[in-house]
Amino acid sequence: MAKIAHDKYYTEDQLAKYCVEKTYEILGSDWDRVIEPSAGAGAYLKYLPEDTLAYDILPEADGIVVADYRQVQLPYMERSLVIGNPPFGRANKLSVQFVKASLLHSDYISLI
């Protein structure tokens, strides 16, 4: 993964594909909602449903909402999956915030 700026490390295409396939293998692929909280250049989006909700503060691909995912207010859904590669920040501070935000509306989280 190449570091760019703003604590961004872009996920390589093959790694994103593997993560999605492994998540589906373990948890299934039938979701009412899929969320990519730190979509960046869209690596995961290539392997997720078209209606995936994708967020990033500095998106670099089409279909990604410009927003800080930690501030997005989403209703809870039982069959909701959050999947992606969020920024870690110093001492994993950001990744913990992404997990906490995800737990407010989703029961299933698959982050690397």
Mark where each language-model region is.
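Class I S-adenosyl-L-methionine-dependent methyltransferase catalytic core
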Residues: 1-112
